[in-house]
């Protein structure tokens, strides 16, 4: 695993440990206010933290599937396939006192990049942390597109290593709430 850094999210209302070298996408292009998006400096990998409205009509594993399919619809996925959905142990989460249930999902979505016709199978790992007291579903996503076949610009050992599932797990387990006022009046 790469060295890491503790990073403020949503104006300091949250923080989490991100892999070293993660680039804040909001420095490159507009990002919706309910998202924090980070990209790998070399690969097409990305990490996304989203504050979403609680989907109270779905519970348990179905809630994780709902958000996975919703993301696929937003991204215009041509196909979505869930590989696994598992409950996430609350005791491992920094948000354990606030999170009522947590799920982790792995799957694939067939997505074409902007201005490209060919769709690629992108592996997605998602963690859904449910905070009903704040009417919020926290969705964390790790996008792992297939490796690019372009040759590296420099010696192999100078390029940062791709992020691993361990990097994503560290993001999920380290996510900490510092200011509940981000959710508005309760």
UniProtKB/Swiss-Prot annotation:
Gene3D superfamilies: Mog1/PsbP, alpha/beta/alpha sandwich. GO terms for biological process: endoplasmic reticulum to Golgi vesicle-mediated transport; heart contraction; mitotic spindle assembly; positive regulation of membrane depolarization during cardiac muscle cell action potential; positive regulation of protein localization to cell surface; positive regulation of protein localization to plasma membrane; protein exit from endoplasmic reticulum; regulation of bundle of His cell action potential. This is Ran guanine nucleotide release factor. Overexpression can rescue the trafficking defect caused by some SCN5A mutations that impair trafficking to the cell membrane. SUPFAM superfamilies: Mog1p/PsbP-like. Keywords: Cell membrane, Cytoplasm, Guanine-nucleotide releasing factor, Membrane, Nucleus, Protein transport, Transport. GO terms for cellular component: caveola; cytoplasm; cytosol; intercalated disc; nucleoplasm; nucleus; perinuclear region of cytoplasm; plasma membrane. Isoform 1 and isoform 2 are ubiquitously expressed. Detected in heart and brain. May regulate the intracellular trafficking of RAN. Promotes guanine nucleotide release from RAN and inhibits binding of new GTP by preventing the binding of the RAN guanine nucleotide exchange factor RCC1. Regulates the levels of GTP-bound RAN in the nucleus, and thereby plays a role in the regulation of RAN-dependent mitotic spindle dynamics. Enhances the expression of SCN5A at the cell membrane in cardiomyocytes. Its main location: nucleus. It is found in: Nucleus; Cytoplasm, Perinuclear region; Cytoplasm; Cell membrane. Monomer. Interacts with RAN, both RAN-GTP and RAN-GDP. Competes with RCC1 for a common binding site on RAN and thereby inhibits RCC1-mediated nucleotide exchange. Forms a complex with RAN-GTP and RANBP1. Interacts with the cytoplasmic loop 2 of SCN5A. One of its GO terms (molecular function) is small GTPase binding. It comes from Homo sapiens (Human). Belongs to the MOG1 family. It holds the Pfam family Mog1. It is a peripheral membrane protein. The gene is RANGRF.
């Amino acid at each position: 695993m790469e060295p890491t850094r503790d990073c403020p999210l949503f104006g300091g209302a949250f923080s989490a440990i991100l892999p070293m070298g993660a680039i804040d996408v909001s420095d490159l292009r507009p990002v919706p206010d309910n998202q924090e998006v980070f990209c790998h400096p070399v690969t097409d990998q990305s990490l996304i933290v989203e504050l979403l409205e609680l989907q109270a009509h779905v519970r348990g594993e179905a809630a994780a599937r709902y958000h996975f399919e919703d993301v696929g619809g937003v991204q215009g996925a041509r196909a979505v396939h869930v590989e696994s959905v598992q409950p996430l142990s609350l005791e491992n989460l920094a948000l354990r006192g606030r999170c009522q249930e947590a799920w982790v999902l792995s799957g694939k979505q067939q997505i074409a990049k902007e201005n490209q016709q060919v769709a690629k199978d992108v592996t997605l790992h998602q963690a859904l942390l449910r905070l009903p007291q704040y009417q919020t579903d926290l969705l964390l996503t790790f996008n792992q597109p297939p490796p690019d076949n372009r040759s590296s610009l420099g010696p192999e050992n100078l390029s940062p290593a791709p992020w691993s599932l361990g990097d994503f797990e560290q993001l999920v387990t380290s996510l900490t709430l510092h200011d509940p006022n981000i959710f508005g009046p309760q």
